[in-house]
């Protein structure tokens, strides 16, 4: 599956044209541009690069390159970049698909010049070599770099420079990554090379080259504009010439002393400005006094940087814990005390609260599938474990404003590490996300409420770019890591208020939360003891993310733009996953877990995480023990940079060997950087400098850091913040006479906070892990609408956890207190649709995003906290954690633009039965469905802060509120009682857009019609329909009406019948008997989907978007049918002492192994966890297995094409290759490849197999980029055809849904003869089909564009099957997001896909 190389034109339009670039044009009209470096322009070595005069050969290279040797974990050369002796180049065409190329050309002609008549692309691989490659190894490198069926499209000379067109002017533009840091792409590419024995490769970066032909010579500014269009200025640059060196000529800066003893505070003020330390008045006073009067010496620049990061607002939350003075009156409680008061009043089931990296509540005793010998090759079996439910939430706002894609990547990655670094380590399960940005100003969109006069800051990305790139970054990171994203929210806002203030999210919100699990025995971190080892595990150090903690604590625009860039981190999801696998192996050891304590590296880098892990005992740390990927880094940079994918852990000395063994298996670096010494200090030494001094007969240099922990990390003096409340001017909502309901809906349904979120959900994996019981999409058409997200704890139990989000920031512009209460109310009215253990078990994360230190905002935040506390205590629920981001403002057009203050409530709770979840899609027809309205506002209909007000350029003056808190409690308990007895068929909360939007959305999702008949009770039409007062709409059966009403009355809850459901797809809205709307469901749904589809066109192929948009008008419930009845595996199989062994094989970046193991386990197999590392090391051989499975995921992060690196690691390691060849030939074995494994089997030639003529690379079928050019995740329909496949026996003739999630799933047949032979032999057993069950190539039914709907290929003997969809993620019915009510199945039971795995078991029995 590939997302990083999803070759959509829009992905090359994410640069910025707001900043002029210094570009140089040579006399030959080739534009390479300037390589901008961290400090000064890079001086490139201009010696001529070595030319390799070789051409791509169609023959396969020989396999005998690597003999399977393996290095130790502490060496891991792929992680440590060595200087390259030379840089060689290979070029490959094309860079992007033909359709994407045409789209890019069209955009260029529109934005740059219509004189441009053609555009051609290629990619350049810039390869750093430690020494020359021999011919045999060179052929291997070429195989890795080339497309297997197009070897002629790879060469050592540029293809673009050969092209000429008579009478046209040509210019070449090349863009690529900045050289100041190694990209994650290069890290994975080098890792692939190492796995194939190409140890000479030290770095491999990819650049993109564009050839423009124009009728007239392009002007300099036009070339600059094009360059800006096709690269990200924050992470990339334009190359002025062919790279001949990766050296940056950066000289590491020596440790400096800051003359505080001589110059006092002035010295700190100067370094504060120079380094962007974000010291405020109180900081400057405290640290001047600390060093002059207490420590009595000059601090080093490393110490000051250290203090700035670990004691920044971002890290220490001074504001939340500080003293507040409002309107001249000291407040008796801090914000932290106010929020914690809810937890102190209602702890109940809390096991971790207001400490650690996450919070947790008491879970259940469950049977978890886990390895018997974690950290080594072994079988998996179920064991009873006491698992608690865990939750964490945080934001990554500042980085996303500066560089949205990497900022969001690392936001997601940092939160993932917060999850797994809780207690002594914990399990990552699923994520939620949220985005708040300014006005999109999307070209061609209908958004008359957006103010076209607003100016946007040049140092920040535009709101539109942030929404697209940040969501791409977070999605791609989660997809590669293997964490499903199952819930979220989106909001845009930009308006000048009646007070004259402009409020807008120029500094955006990128919200990321995670729900996971933790073994109850691991909830408490161990305390450091003398002799314990301080260990860092994860990726190497790079010069990135310098000062992120301090920079994120400032209003955007206060800091230097280059410092802002330096503060943005870079993510490597594949490295993050390897890190998590090491942590998971440790925690699955149970009571033998070697991890005593764990903290993830985030804001402040080592500055923060190391001091956290050694506090209060202290340790001496050797900076040179840290694994670095850039040897030019200074002590300051190694200590302070926020390079990601790192944890600090404490282990006992005797655990060192087992930890090294686990790290070696997962190919992760491990470094012991110090030992707990009990001195209470953090002392940072430089052993290299000390050795040099010793050699020269000099005393060792003083430590770069030597600080008493208590004085910089312990109880430091509180800060005091003073505010006055501000009464902002308000104006009543004024809707012009003559505005109709349809006029209003045309606007409201297009507002991003209301409209479809399809553009966010189809690009993110929502099924990986197999533990997702409820994600965003619902109903027969899989519309993005779910209110609550639900996870399962295991594959064998029905217990789980649910989470839901509430946030109402626009209401806060009118009344911060009401906003807080509404956020709580929305979270609960979303959460209520999952059956939970009890309302009193609900806990929540509270995330505060305010410009808190600006006038009026601190007091508003304080008032909101008081209201939040009071409401939660009355409800019996509590906040148990959260984060704050308190510099939510940016400079623009001469003013400070504050973001609307936002409080995001993420409620989470335990579920006794995950199958009892109600979705919003209407299900009842034939006059049986009745709609009930449960009104929490008891008749009030206030429009202030509503979507209606926003789309008419106003906010109004009368704010909705939760006036009766106890009534919300009654409603929650009452609806829970209805769900327990299966009396509710559909339900949805009332939120953005009001009652009418809630009802419409339910109809959209169910593909039904509705008749709404409402009474105005003396208020206006718009108040009746669009007020966003809290409430619920329930669909119930007419036969259950009396029972429902009676049960609600038992909870003192009243409900009103407001309409009925119809099978006819027509929506009719009456108020006081007058019809105000009568329109087709599809027509209104098209309005609701319009904004999402426009955003989709900026992310995937426009023709695919149009096809889906038009097709949606005619969609109907899929016509699925089964040719068999699913059943659980026979107990005789499950109880056998000896079961057939199946090797579940994974490579670096694979992420589908556990759900695959669970599926085979459920079919009576003994699944084994086997890595390629195990096979290379000889720890296991394949001769003991009857089945092998190649799992899904992103092996090597899909670098160099999907599964290419995995295939290379097998093909070019002789001992491993021979094992696979022998296994393939054995007549009593079978193999299965899913997704990435499917792509691998094609590359290995296992399907359709040599007998069909597909063994040569040039004719072997491959799975290539989806036609849409993007990763796609959908629950799609497939039909099962007759075939020899042993795993699909007895399933022929069935049509059903299955999860599919990939970026490269389009079957491609270079040789038509192979395709014909394959079809004639019935070797394409699985086909994508439409709603009628017909095989199709139409998008999105066929999500990748495979010819003839081909979704799977098998071998002629049926033993080997490769398929792109994921049956292992839906082998249980609760994993299905929807299925026909006509199916005779139990939601708690097996799904039809289990039969696939049972068939394999039956076949083995018959052999």
From Swiss-Prot:
Q: Which reaction does it catalyse?
A: N(2)-formyl-N(1)-(5-phospho-beta-D-ribosyl)glycinamide + L-glutamine + ATP + H2O = 2-formamido-N(1)-(5-O-phospho-beta-D-ribosyl)acetamidine + L-glutamate + ADP + phosphate + H(+)
Per its UniProt entry, which superkingdom is the organism in?
Eukaryota
Check the record and name the InterPro entries matching this protein. Answer: Class_I_gatase-like, FGAR-AT_N, FGAR-AT_PurM_N-like, PurL_large, PurL_linker, PurM-like_C_dom, PurM-like_C_sf, PurM-like_N_sf
Give the residues the record marks as binding ATP.
407-418, 487-489, 786, 991
SUPFAM superfamilies listed in its UniProt record: Class I glutamine amidotransferase-like, FGAM synthase PurL, linker domain, PurM C-terminal domain-like, PurM N-terminal domain-like, PurS-like
Residues given in the record as Mg(2+) binding sites: 787, 826, 830, 989
Positions of the Glutamine amidotransferase type-1 domain: 1141-1381
Q: Knockout consequence?
A: Lethal to the male gametophyte.
Where is this chain's protein located in or outside the cell? Answer: Plastid, Chloroplast; Mitochondrion
Tell me the CDD domains matching this sequence: GATase1_FGAR_AT (cd01740), PurL_repeat1 (cd02203), PurL_repeat2 (cd02204)
Show the transit peptide stretch: 1-53
EC number, as in UniProt: 6.3.5.3
Q: Which UniProt keywords apply?
A: ATP-binding, Chloroplast, Glutamine amidotransferase, Ligase, Magnesium, Metal-binding, Mitochondrion, Nucleotide-binding, Plastid, Purine biosynthesis, Transit peptide
> Its Gene Ontology molecular function terms?
ATP binding; metal ion binding; phosphoribosylformylglycinamidine synthase activity
Query: Part of which pathway?
Result: Purine metabolism; IMP biosynthesis via de novo pathway; 5-amino-1-(5-phospho-D-ribosyl)imidazole from N(2)-formyl-N(1)-(5-phospho-D-ribosyl)glycinamide: step 1/2
The record's annotation in NCBIfam families points to:
FGAM_synt (TIGR01735), PRK05297.1 (NF003672)
Q: Which family does it belong to?
A: In the N-terminal section; belongs to the FGAMS family.
UniProt name for this protein: Probable phosphoribosylformylglycinamidine synthase, chloroplastic/mitochondrial
Q: Please name the taxonomic classification of the source.
A: Eukaryota, Viridiplantae, Streptophyta, Embryophyta, Tracheophyta
